[in-house]
Amino acid sequence: MIDSVKLRRDCAADFFSHYEYLCALQDSVPLPAVRACLRDGVLDFNADRLRAVDWAPLLSTLRVNRDLPLVAIKSSFQPWLGETVLRSGGADTHRICRNRVPAVRSKDISFQLCKALRGCLSVSGVLRNLELNGLILRERDLTSLTKGLSKSTSLVHLSLANCPIGDGGLEIICQGIKNSVTLKTVNFTGCNLTWQGACHMAKILKYQTMRRHEETWAESLRYRRPDLDCMAGLRRITLNCNTLIGDQGASAFADSLSEDLWLRALDLQQCGLTSEGAKALLEALETNRTLVVLDIRKNPLIDHSMMKAVIKKVLQNGRSADSEYQWVTSPSSKEPSKTAKQRKKTIVLGSSRKGKATIRIGLATKKPSSNGRKQGLGKDCYAPNPLPPGASGFLPWRTAERAKRSRSSSLIKTRDLSNHLKKSDFPVTVTVESPSSSETDETEDSSESVQEAPQKTSIKEETLQEKLEECLRQLKEERVIRLKADKRVSELEHENAQLRNINFSLSEALHAQSLTNMILDDEGVLGSIENSFQKFHAFLDLLKDAGLGQLATMAGIDQSDFHLLGRPQMNSTVNTPIQEQKALEDETLHPKQTATGQMQDIRFQKITSDALIPLPLNTVQDPASAQEAVGASRDHLGVVGLEQQEGSAAGFIAKTGSPLAGGIPGGRSQREEEVLSKHSRSSSEKGSTASEPSRRPSAERHPRKDLLSDADPPGNSESKGPGDRRSLLNEPIKSESLKKCISIKKENRIVTVSSKTIKSKPNLLEHSESDTLGSDFELQERVHSSAHLT
């Protein structure tokens, strides 16, 4: 047991011895591909050459190793590359893959490899470089590898170049990178990363920057100067050949680089950057003075001037820095080398019956099998590897020399020529072949092709030169056209801006106008306005008919406003005849007209119609004006005085009593009188609610007319003559009770007239007769009551 423990310790210290021991246990031989670099103390091999059974001893040795400073495992297997093969049945071709799939491509082998690397990273204190190139690493493989990265105490460089881990795999790896205290450089070239992967790396930079600032603050206490180079964190990030990083990834790096003081190199070759991404990086360099390498070459979308400005700014930062971080060699096209394929030249030395000597100058390839004799040039071309004596195939040097002489006897003449050609850089092969017609034709054709080749090349060069000149000329024309087009576009944009401003101002004006016209465009609003004007002018017509034109003039209404709409005037409910209006105007102009003239006017009104009395609309009278109107009516009736009225009251009642008593026809029944009285009362009640304000002016204007027309019944008014009427009018009012009776009668008369105006014209005469009968009957009753009171 103790010997086994000692053996494991010794094997951990010596990789090669432990690997040989494990191979001997399974009856296998250590692979030459693995042993090749072990002499230098590193493990570097091509994983495609190992079979599945060869991986077990290697991984077991790697898991416990502690002395290897570098582990590099590579795979160049490309399954999409095949070989073109002709089918047996026809000319169709297809690609087949003749190479077997290596064992490292399997899930189990890759997982076991990552577990072995995790163990090596955990226990080794000298492993500084870990390179995995072209391996297929899955999620669980990366998770296992990340655990080893976080535990490593010596790893400085990590490379996963050409491993298609993608953004998800990089995110897993970043979990181990951000907590590593020794890792300084990472290489993710060709890992199928996008701008999201670049964002993951930018977050790692920000995280490490925060931790470094904390360490810097701690190291700066007591006036100490912190050493930034000795702090942990990444110093170089290589993301070449990830074309999907683009400007978004460059912007993410620019954001993190603006405050970073530790990153020294950032490689972004062939990452799909444009001038916008380069501009963002250039802005970050304005504040970052520690970045000495920012490689954005091989990005054709970046403007040449922008790339030059970025590189110039980076070189200014690197003047005072050391040369620890160098620019990565740009992946350029392979230069022609000695192994490149060259055109073969054939020189015919001569021909005879026995044969011809042919010299081919060019790349020495495998000689196809032929029936002709092929011999070497002699001593200069014959250099066999020396074999130890006793080995199979051993030939003494003297015997070999005699064989050379016998072979070179037929080529003595060509030896001098071959020595002359050997001075050149081209390999020379000299063969002697038997003459044949086909070979002679081939020789002639080849000689002709040697002469025609330079001519064809010169013709092609001239053609290409002409095309180049034509393209340059077209490019110049296109540039001129482009400048004109840009100028025209700028002019059109200016005109478009002006037209847009004009359109905006016009739209605002139209909008304001539409708001004002929107109300007037409505038919309902126009109709309501028209109706309001019609009602207003009708009201003005009523004022004019009522004789209140002066009131309208005082209110500021011009006489031209009357009859504005050209429609018939809206008079009172019953139109007054022209003669009646003239009679009323005469009464107002001549207040002291004789009683005979007044009686004739009243008689004329009774004959035509009782409903033709105009209704004044001066309803807004104050009590003072009402009293003045009453006084004026008394003056028109010729009232002499209060004493004379009281003295002649009894005589007036005696004179008028018999006619009033006899004025009622004897043939009327009691029922007919009740109906008439009820009708008169109902009409008076209806009219009192509508025309109460207009009662007093009408009653005061015509007190005598109401008295005389109501005092005489319709039957007796025709029988009486003009003389009786005059005597009746000329008698004075002698008592106060008669005044009350007259005022009550005037009010009833106004009520009857207002009730007539509400009803229609066909029933006008009928209502007037009933009102006259009712009013006569009431007058008789009130006269009798006043007589009893006196």
Curated annotation (Swiss-Prot):
Compartments reported by the entry: Cytoplasm, Cytoskeleton, Microtubule organizing center, Centrosome; Cytoplasm, Cytoskeleton, Microtubule organizing center, Centrosome, Centriole; Cytoplasm, Cytoskeleton, Cilium basal body
Ranges of compositional bias, category Low complexity: 428-438
Expression sites (tissue/organ): Expressed by photoreceptor cells in the retina.
InterPro entries: Cep78, Leu-rich_rpt, LRR_dom_sf
PTM-bearing positions, type Phosphoserine: 330, 332
Keyword Nucleotide-binding: no
An annotated GO cellular component: ciliary basal body
Disruption of the gene: reported phenotype: Male mice are sterile due to aberrant sperm morphology and almost null sperm motility. Sperm flagella show impaired microtubule arrangements and elongated centrioles. Mice also display defects in retina and outer hair cells of the cochlea.
Sections of the chain in a coiled coil: 455-510
Biased composition (Basic and acidic residues): 693-708, 721-732
Principal subcellular localisation of the protein: cytoplasm
Start and end residues of each stretch annotated as Disordered: 325-345, 362-385, 428-462, 654-732, 756-790
Pfam families: LRR_6
Domain of life (superkingdom): Eukaryota
Keywords recorded for this protein, A-Z: Cell projection, Cilium, Cilium biogenesis/degradation, Coiled coil, Cytoplasm, Cytoskeleton, Phosphoprotein
GO BP term, pick one: negative regulation of protein ubiquitination
Family per similarity comment: Belongs to the CEP78 family.
PANTHER family in the cross-refs: CENTROSOMAL PROTEIN OF 78 KDA
Role, per record: Centriole wall protein that localizes to mature centrioles and regulates centriole and cilia biogenesis. Involved in centrosome duplication: required for efficient PLK4 centrosomal localization and PLK4-induced overduplication of centrioles. Involved in cilium biogenesis and controls cilium length. Acts as a regulator of protein stability by preventing ubiquitination of centrosomal proteins, such as CCP110 and tektins. Associates with the EDVP complex, preventing ubiquitination and degradation of CCP110.
Quaternary data: Interacts with PLK4. Interacts with FAM161A. Interacts with IFT20; regulating IFT20 stability and localization. Interacts with TTC21A; regulating TTC21A stability and localization. Interacts with USP16; promoting USP16-dependent deubiquitination of tektins. Interacts with DCAF1/VPRBP; promoting localization of the EDVP complex to centrosomes. Interacts with CEP350; promoting CEP78 localization to centrosome and centriole.
Name of the protein: Centrosomal protein of 78 kDa
